């Protein structure tokens, strides 16, 4: 694989934060929430390559999509805006909450144009709503770069694989196998991390904890995606073996809805180590980790995929249809 276009957005490697007293074994937290003061987390790692491709293509604007409180939409609005791109996001409804309000405020405050899309209307690039948005931007004279829903661009997998290789270097010498837990929707982050760890030769297992709440997201897709990323990096696809990856359901609460048990785990993590995770996604994966850490040997690690930036007084024009999320 030749060198891919990339823009510098993060500071890496991010640290491994030890947490004692919450489980029979020490737990490590991979602090990717600290990789950028603008907006941290796995979405920003991915944007280094996604926005690198946009810049290389000569784009003046990016069009993406996500739910109303999407971490990806907020990250894109902030980072792409700072690089001079005009940002439009097609946003779908979801349950309201503190995380949704924060991300909407950050995206609007960064100047993103947020276009509400009714429930049931597809924003897939092949569908009418998405095609109309592209056509409108082009009519304004923009050169548009499309970023898939939630940032699930194939080049994002490369960013996550490099993160996996980064972790492998940090974890050498720790008791094996390395057991990584993280929240998952599209599973691309988990797939990339698994690919990087597999190519490193380190004994490991990546557990992607589904936060979508739909059985349709579970199945063999994670292994296939991880193998695709490994091949994209020039390695053997079968370096990622079936036992390297797990995609497990989370029964506590549906997508975007806090779960009381997971919320209590988030409180414990904050009290024990001053590490803050959101209750909708990160807390669910951490809850799952705590339920397994006593039964399996090795080193248990929670990958903090979110951003802990507060919205503060940042605010921009929010479409009337989205005001219900921030009021």
Curated annotation (Swiss-Prot):
The keyword Isomerase applies. Pathway: Antibiotic biosynthesis. Disruption phenotype: Disruption of the gene abolishes nocardicin A production, but the mutant retains the ability to produce the intermediate isonocardicin A. Its cofactor is pyridoxal 5'-phosphate. One of its GO terms (molecular function) is D-cysteine desulfhydrase activity. It catalyses: isonocardicin C = nocardicin C; isonocardicin A = nocardicin A. Belongs to the ACC deaminase/D-cysteine desulfhydrase family. This is Nocardicin C-9' epimerase.
């Amino acid at each position: 694989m030749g060198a891919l276009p990339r823009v510098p957005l993060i500071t890496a490697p991010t640290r491994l934060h030890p947490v004692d007293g919450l489980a029979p074994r020490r737990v490590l937290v991979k602090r990717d929430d600290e990789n950028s003061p603008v907006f941290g987390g796995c979405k920003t790692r991915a944007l280094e390559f996604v926005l690198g491709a946009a810049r290389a293509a000569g784009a003046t604007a990016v069009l993406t999509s996500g739910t109303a409180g999407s971490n990806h939409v907020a990250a894109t609005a902030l980072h792409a805006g700072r690089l001079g791109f005009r940002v439009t996001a097609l946003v779908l409804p979801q349950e309201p909450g503190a995380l949704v309000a924060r991300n909407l405020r950050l995206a609007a405050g960064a100047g993103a144009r947020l276009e509400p899309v009714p429930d049931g209307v597809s924003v897939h690039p092949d569908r009418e709503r998405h095609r109309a948005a592209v056509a409108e931007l082009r009519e304004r004279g923009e050169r548009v770069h499309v970023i898939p829903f939630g940032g699930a661009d194939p080049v994002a997998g490369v960013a996550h694989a490099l993160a996996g290789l980064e972790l492998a270097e940090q974890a050498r010498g720790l008791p094996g196998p390395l057991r990584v837990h993280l929240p998952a929707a599209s599973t691309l982050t988990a797939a990339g991390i698994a690919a990087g760890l597999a190519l490193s030769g380190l004994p490991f297992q990546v557990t992607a904890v589904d936060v979508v709440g739909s059985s349709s997201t579970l199945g063999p897709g994670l292994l296939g995606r991880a193998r695709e990323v490994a091949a994209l990096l020039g390695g053997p696809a079968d370096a990622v073996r079936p036992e390297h990856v797990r995609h497990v359901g989370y029964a506590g609460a549906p997508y975007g809805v806090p779960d009381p048990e997971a919320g209590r785990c988030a409180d414990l993590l904050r009290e024990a180590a001053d590490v803050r995770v959101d209750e909708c996604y990160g807390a669910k994966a951490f809850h799952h980790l705590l339920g397994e850490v006593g039964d399996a040997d090795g080193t248990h690690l929670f990958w903090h995929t979110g951003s802990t930036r507060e919205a503060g007084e940042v605010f921009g024009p929010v479409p009337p249809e989205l005001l219900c999320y921030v009021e």
